[in-house]
UniProtKB/Swiss-Prot annotation:
GO terms for biological process: bacterial-type flagellum-dependent cell motility. This is Flagellar P-ring protein. The lineage of its organism: Bacteria, Pseudomonadati, Pseudomonadota, Alphaproteobacteria, Hyphomicrobiales. It comes from the Bacteria. Assembles around the rod to form the L-ring and probably protects the motor/basal body from shearing forces during rotation.
Length: 373
C-alpha cells in the first residue's frame, strides 16, 4: 500500500509541477499526435484458420468437431485422402484470425495478426498458423496470413497440478499477413481534409484551426480551416495546393493542447488516474471499514472401538468481526496535490480511495468528470 501511495504522490507532484509551469510553458503537441485524418482510418479484417504443430495442447476432436472437419477439408484441398478413423492427436487448434488494415496500405505490405482459440485447446505455444485468408466487412479478401505463433503466457502441467501464467490460448504472428488487395482510396480527389481529434475538446479544436489558418494565410494568402465541433476540424484545399504536401505540412504544426479534468477509476484492478486539472471544493471525509472473518474448522468424530459406528464430520464455524473507525480529514483542495495528500492522511487502501472519490463526486465537491471502468 505504501508503494501505491508513493506512486500516486509521485504522479501528483509531476502533474502539479507541470500545472505550476503552465503560464511559462504550456503543453504542446504536433497535430499528427493529437488528431487523425478521417479518410485515413483503419479497416478490420477477420478469418478462420488452423494452427498446427502443437505439443498435445490442441483441440480434442470430440469436443471440437469443427476442428477435425476443417483439417480434413484442408487436406482434401491439398490432394491428400482423409479416409480412415478418427485421429486422437491434439496437435491442431481452430482459431479466429484478426488484423487491422491500415490506411493507404499497398499490396505486398505486411500486417501483424492476432490468433484466438475457438475450441478447447489449452495452449497455442509452438504452433504455426497455416495459410488463412482475411476478409473485410464487404466479404472481399484483402490479406493472407501464415507464420509461427508467439504466445506471451505459459502453462506447466503435471498429473496432479497445473500452473498457468498469462493467456496461452491467444497469440500474435508478427508480420504474418501479406496484403493482396488495395483498399480503394479517393484521397487525391478530395476537396478538403477532415481532422478528427483523438480527445475531443473545443479549445484544442479552435487552436488547431487558428494554427492552420495562420500557416495558410502566410502560404496561400487566406484562412482554410474551420472547427466544426469539439472533434472535427475541416481544412479546405487551396487551389494551388497538393493534398499530400498540405497534409504533411499541417500534421507537423505545433499546437497547445487542452483536456478536461478527469478522474479515471478501474474498480477491477484498483487503478486510479487523476488528471492535473482536477479541483476539489472543501469537504470533510471519514473512512472506516468493517472486517468479518469466517473460519471453518470441521471436527472429525471417531466411533467407539467395536461399536460398528461410522466416522462423522461435525462442522464448526468461528466468526470474528472487527470494525475500525477512520479519522476525519478536511480536504480543502484547490489542486491535485492537496487531494492526494488528504487521501494519504486518512490512510486508506486503493479500494477505499475509490469509494471516497465516488462520495466526493456525489457531494458535488469533485470538479471533474468521474470515469468508471
Amino acid at each position: 500500500m505504501k508503494l501505491f501511495f508513493r506512486i500516486v504522490t509521485l504522479v501528483a507532484v509531476v502533474a502539479m509541477s507541470l500545472a505550476d509551469m503552465a503560464p511559462a510553458w504550456a503543453l504542446t503537441s504536433r497535430i499528427k499526435d493529437i488528431a487523425s485524418l478521417q479518410a485515413g482510418r483503419d479497416n478490420q479484417l477477420i478469418g478462420y484458420g488452423l494452427i498446427v504443430g502443437l505439443q498435445g495442447t490442441g483441440d480434442g476432436f470430440r469436443s471440437s468437431p469443427f476442428t477435425e472437419q476443417s483439417m480434413r477439408a484442408m487436406l482434401q484441398n491439398l490432394g491428400i485422402s482423409t479416409q480412415g478413423g478418427q485421429s486422437n492427436a491434439k496437435n491442431t487448434a481452430a482459431v479466429m484470425v484478426t488484423a487491422n488494415l491500415p490506411p493507404f496500405a499497398s499490396p505486398g505490405s505486411r500486417l501483424d495478426v492476432t490468433v484466438s482459440s475457438l475450441g478447447d485447446a489449452t495452449s497455442l505455444r509452438g504452433g504455426t498458423l497455416v495459410m488463412t485468408s482475411l476478409s473485410g466487412a464487404d466479404g472481399q479478401i484483402y490479406a493472407v496470413a501464415q507464420g509461427s505463433v508467439i504466445v506471451s503466457g505459459f502453462q506447466a502441467q503435471g498429473q496432479a497440478a497445473t500452473v498457468t501464467e498469462g493467456v496461452t490460448t491467444a497469440g500474435r504472428v508478427p508480420g504474418g499477413a501479406i496484403i493482396e488487395r488495395e483498399l480503394p482510396s479517393h484521397f487525391k480527389d478530395s476537396v478538403n481534409l477532415v481532422l478528427q481529434l483523438r480527445n475531443p475538446d473545443f479549445s484544442t479544436a479552435i487552436r488547431i484551426a487558428d494554427i492552420v489558418n495562420g500557416y495558410a494565410s502566410a502560404r496561400f494568402g487566406g484562412p482554410v480551416a474551420e472547427a466544426k465541433d469539439s472533434q472535427e476540424v475541416v481544412i479546405q484545399k487551396p487551389r494551388t495546393a497538393d493534398l499530400t504536401r498540405l497534409m504533411a505540412d499541417v500534421e507537423n504544426l505545433i499546437v497547445e493542447t487542452d483536456t478536461p479534468a478527469k478522474v479515471v477509476i478501474n474498480e477491477r484492478t484498483g487503478t486510479i488516474v487523476i488528471g492535473s486539472d482536477v479541483r476539489v471544493s472543501p469537504v470533510a471525509v471519514s473512512y472506516g471499514t468493517l472486517t468479518v472473518q469466517v473460519t471453518e474448522t470441521p471436527q472429525i468424530i471417531q466411533p467407539e472401538p467395536f461399536s460398528r459406528g461410522r466416522t462423522a464430520v461435525q462442522p464448526q464455524t468461528d466468526i470474528a468481526a472487527e470494525q475500525t473507525g477512520g479519522r476525519v480529514a478536511i480536504i480543502d483542495g484547490p489542486d491535485l496535490r492537496t487531494l492526494v495528500a488528504g487521501l494519504n492522511n486518512i490512510g486508506v487502501k486503493p479500494d477505499g480511495i475509490i469509494a471516497i472519490l465516488q462520495g466526493i463526486k456525489s457531494a458535488g465537491a469533485l470538479q471533474a468528470e468521474l470515469v468508471l471502468q
